[in-house]
Design a protein with these regions (language model features):
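An N-terminally biased module of ancient metal coordination in phosphate/nucleic-acid-related enzymes
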Residues: 1-78
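Extended substrate/RNA-proximal surfaces in nucleic-acid metabolism proteins
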Residues: 54-142
Length: 142
């Protein structure tokens, strides 16, 4: 569908642009309908909606939810990302996403702890400082 992008990320999760910058860049490319689908957070939605007003752009609420799927026959766990669009009752979802933020922060701490023997110091606080005072948004930018 021309002019529609239903899977985007801002710097609220693992993108590089702020929601406002993302909307502006999308508008420059001729996008008129955009879904902000940050990983495990909808914190950028209001910012995107506000920015979209000056571009006559429609914003669709969205989120990319990280989950695990277990295959019983192999006893292996697989990471699965599910993109949810245009949700209505958001309260239960917000509770789930808050848990995901805590899991991400713990994962970042575990990674930093594994690095201590290699580099000789705990860099967790430095990592948090580098993510612009957003410790609940420690992600792998792509």
């Amino acid at each position: 569908m021309e002019g529609v992008d239903l899977h985007t990320h801002s710097n609220i999760s693992d993108g590089t642009f702020t929601p406002k910058q993302l909307v502006a860049a999308a508008a420059e490319k001729g996008i008129h309908t955009l879904a902000l689908t940050d990983h495990d957070t909808m914190d950028g939605l209001a910012l995107a909606e506000s920015a979209a007003k000056s571009h006559a752009m429609r914003i669709i609420s969205g989120v990319e939810i990280s989950s695990q799927w277990s295959r019983p026959s192999t006893q292996k766990n697989y990471g699965v990302h599910v993109v949810a669009l245009n949700m209505q009752d958001l309260e239960p979802l917000h509770k789930c996403l808050e848990q995901q933020k805590q899991i991400r922060a713990r994962r970042a701490k575990q990674i930093c702890d594994l690095l201590i023997p290699l580099i000789g110091e705990d860099i967790y606080l430095d990592v948090l400082a580098k993510v612009e005072q957003m410790p609940d948004r420690v992600t792998r930018t792509h």
